[in-house]
Amino acid sequence: MEDYILKVEELNYNYSDGTHALKGINMNIKRGEVTAILGGNGVGKSTLFQNFNGILKPSSGRILFDNKPIDYSRKGIMKLRESIGIVFQDPDNQLFSASVYQDVSFGAVNMKLPEDEIRKRVDNALKRTGIEHLKDKPTHCLSFGQKKRVAIAGVLVMEPKVLILDEPTAGLDPMGVSEIMKLLVEMQKELGITIIIATHDIDIVPLYCDNVFVMKEGRVILQGNPKEVFAEKEVIRKVNLRLPRIGHLMEILKEKDGFVFDELDLTIGQARKTINSWKNKIFND
């Protein structure tokens, strides 16, 4: 039996101006895995995330967290936000304290934890995100990548069960992208945190994500593991997305260069294995 930490049932959300942002969303998020939400700008990803942790309340439908409907009382929402943390795309929208230590400690202080527990959690969060050496530095003096890590640490200090990140790799150089994704996967594996990301960086999805949902105009139109989702090439392209670069290369080799592949490989490792197998078969025949 599948273990889902979040269940979304017929979720609709309307903004006050009449915009119908989410339209009958049904979605199950597996506990302890990395899930990607894909889709163009304006399809409802951010609205969905804000419904997940109670910033917004559904117009209709419901969300279950840990198999219980979300409690929208003040106490219930405060508890929910300790368990489901959001890291925004632009860390400058999330950092507001004078120093890194003060900023990271904010959530723990707000939880009214004992001082020694606050110090312990902050130290652990700083160490986990690799920014212990920055703890006394003013937040406005940090690089963009460092600010991203501080924002993650500020959520991590509350020891959430779910960590939601809106475009976690946006604005980072290639090394920064790799480092931040490895950090997230490390937290998922070692702490058991469920990771949910919205991203336009298609190439990271088959490398780091277990599950994928594709959205269009407020609806989920595809879901599955990366191979299942990217096998729907026509649908992917119709919603202004693309295949991962390796997947596109394998598609070209098959359709234009006579290579024979059973499946569409999406990573370098998968592609090497398939091409070597094909090469050996040709030479042996």
Curated annotation (Swiss-Prot):
GO function terms (MF aspect): ATP binding; ATP hydrolysis activity; ATPase-coupled transmembrane transporter activity
Main location class: membrane
Sorted UniProt keywords: ATP-binding, Cell membrane, Membrane, Nucleotide-binding, Translocase, Transport
Primary enzyme class: translocase
Pfam families per UniProt: ABC_tran
Binding site for ATP: 39-46
Entry membrane topology: Peripheral membrane protein
GO biological process, one term: cobalt ion transport
Subunit structure: Forms a stable energy-coupling factor (ECF) transporter complex composed of 2 membrane-embedded substrate-binding proteins (S component), 2 ATP-binding proteins (A component) and 2 transmembrane proteins (T component).
Protein name: Energy-coupling factor transporter ATP-binding protein EcfA3
Organism: Clostridium perfringens (strain ATCC 13124 / DSM 756 / JCM 1290 / NCIMB 6125 / NCTC 8237 / Type A)
